[in-house]
C-alpha cells in the first residue's frame, strides 16, 4: 500500500530529500527507469509522472538536453514531483558504479532489438533503459547487452514511438507481470443508473 510521505525535489540543485521515508513508501517491487541522455523536457516530465503513478525510480544519465528546472519538465510532471525519487549520473559508467546490480537485471528498449517486449521476464527491481529521442541507446551498450534488448512492435514505416509512450508501455508490462505491487487496482465510480 502507498504510504504518505514528505518528499520534494529541489529543481535548481536537483537534491534528494527524505530518501529513507521515500524508500519505505512501497511494500512491493520497485522498477528502475533509466533515461540515457534524454533531449526533450516534456518527455522527461511525462515519464516522471508515470514513475510517480507506479512507484518507479527515475534515473537520468547525462548529458541532458534540458535543464531539469525547465518549466516544461515541471509542467509535464504536474504536481507529482514529490512522489518521484530521481537520481542523476554523469554517464552510464557512473550509474553502473553506483548500482552494479543494474547490469544483472536490465532490459534495453530499442527499435533494433531482435525480440519483442512480450518475451521479456521482468523481475522485482529490474532496470529498464531507454535512449535519447533522436538516436536511441549507444550501440556499444546495446551490443554488450544484446540478449537483453527488447522492442515494441510497430509498422515498418514508423521509425519509433514517442519516448514517454514507450516508457509507459514497458513499465506497465513489467508491473503487470509482477502483479501491480503497491498499486490501487480499482477506482470508485458513482452507481450505474437504472
Regions found by a protein language model. Give the residues of each.
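Post-transcriptional modification and biogenesis factors for structured RNAs
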Residues: 2, 6-194
Amino acid at each position: 500500500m502507498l504510504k504518505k510521505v514528505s518528499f520534494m525535489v529541489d529543481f535548481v540543485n536537483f537534491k534528494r530529500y527524505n530518501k529513507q521515508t521515500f524508500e519505505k513508501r512501497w511494500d512491493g517491487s520497485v522498477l528502475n527507469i533509466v533515461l540515457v541522455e534524454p533531449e526533450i523536457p516534456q518527455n522527461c516530465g511525462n515519464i516522471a509522472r508515470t514513475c510517480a503513478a507506479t512507484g518507479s525510480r527515475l534515473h537520468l544519465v547525462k548529458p541532458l538536453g534540458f535543464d531539469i528546472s525547465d518549466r516544461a519538465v515541471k509542467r509535464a510532471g504536474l504536481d507529482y514531483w514529490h512522489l518521484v525519487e530521481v537520481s542523476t549520473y554523469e554517464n552510464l559508467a557512473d550509474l553502473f558504479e553506483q548500482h552494479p546490480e543494474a547490469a544483472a537485471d536490465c532490459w534495453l528498449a530499442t527499435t533494433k532489438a531482435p525480440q519483442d517486449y512480450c518475451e521479456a521476464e521482468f523481475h522485482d527491481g529490474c532496470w529498464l533503459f531507454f535512449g535519447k529521442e533522436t538516436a536511441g541507446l549507444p550501440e556499444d551498450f546495446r551490443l554488450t547487452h544484446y540478449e537483453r534488448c527488447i522492442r515494441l512492435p510497430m509498422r515498418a514505416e514508423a521509425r519509433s514511438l514517442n519516448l514517454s509512450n514507450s516508457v509507459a508501455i514497458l513499465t506497465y508490462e513489467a508491473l503487470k507481470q509482477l502483479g501491480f505491487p503497491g498499486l490501487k487496482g480499482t477506482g470508485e465510480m458513482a452507481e450505474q443508473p437504472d
